[in-house]
A protein has these predicted regions:
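Short Fe-S-cluster ligation motifs
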Residues: 1-20
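C-terminal catalytic domain of Rieske-type non-heme iron oxygenases
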Residues: 21-236
Length: 236
């Protein structure tokens, strides 16, 4: 019977799936927002009937917010035209809009390592009360070729009365609205055919999509190389 390294944190259970390159689980390195008590939030998770790569493509395409979610509570503002830029980080990259910030879904940061996750901010209108931007930390778990499960922590950095007010408003009013936005993503991605990439036409806004595909392709090559090396060692 195979066992796995399991850690409970941030109201979730993290299971390490060993690989030939990393058979022993490294320390669980969570995003700061999931360990810092100054951040308050809620975890939402949902099974999606689409390949996990479609979900990742969607997350690194900030321009989709002002189109797909144009009638939503948080994403109805800002320009529908812009240029995207990509900046490398020590552990991944950030893709962001050039001409605006803080008006819509304007940037995504991807982090790669023992786990892959994204970080992004959404603007909150004045009706949401004090507390600043609405941050999302997202993980995408592949299930099989046609299914994945998404985990999104919805967070806000606030304290005292602002924290209590936001948590109350989220449960009483905002949660349903945020789920409606997530459903728009799920329905769109679930309706995409498996071979959609064969008919796509990428353009400048898709610089994040192109980048994450290159990263994932290299990660797959490294994994296959590690498995081949492990098989050769076992055969000796």
């Amino acid at each position: 019977v195979q066992s796995f390294e399991v850690t409970e944190a941030a109201v979730a259970v993290f299971v390490y799936m060993p690989s030939a390159a990393q058979p022993v689980a490294p320390p669980l390195d969570l995003p700061k927002e999931l360990t810092d008590p100054e951040w308050a939030g809620f975890l939402c998770t949902s099974p999606w009937q689409c390949n996990s790569r479609y979900t990742l493509d969607n997350l690194v395409d900030p321009m989709h917010g002002c189109y797909l979610h144009a009638q939503s509570f948080t994403l109805a503002y800002g320009s529908k035209q812009d240029i995207m830029k990509l900046d490398k980080t020590q552990s991944g990259f950030v893709v962001s809009r050039v001409a605006q910030a803080g008006e819509n879904f304007d940037w995504t940061e991807m982090t790669f390592g023992a786990s892959t996750y994204c970080r992004l901010d959404l603007p909150y209108p004045a009706a949401a009360g004090p507390g600043g931007m609405f941050r999302i930390i997202g993980y995408v778990l592949p299930v099989d070729e046609h299914n994945c499960t998404v985990f999104f922590w919805r967070l806000r950095k606030c304290s005292g009365l602002a924290r209590d007010s936001w948590r109350f408003l989220y449960r009483a009013l905002f949660e349903e609205r945020h789920w409606n936005v997530l459903e728009q993503d799920r329905e769109m991605l679930s309706a995409m055919p498996d071979d959609a990439r064969k008919r796509e036409m990428l353009y400048q806004h898709d610089v994040g999509v192109s980048r994450i595909r290159l990263v994932l392709k290299q990660m797959a090559r490294d994994q296959l190389a590690a498995e081949d090396a492990a098989a050769m060692r076992s055969a000796v």
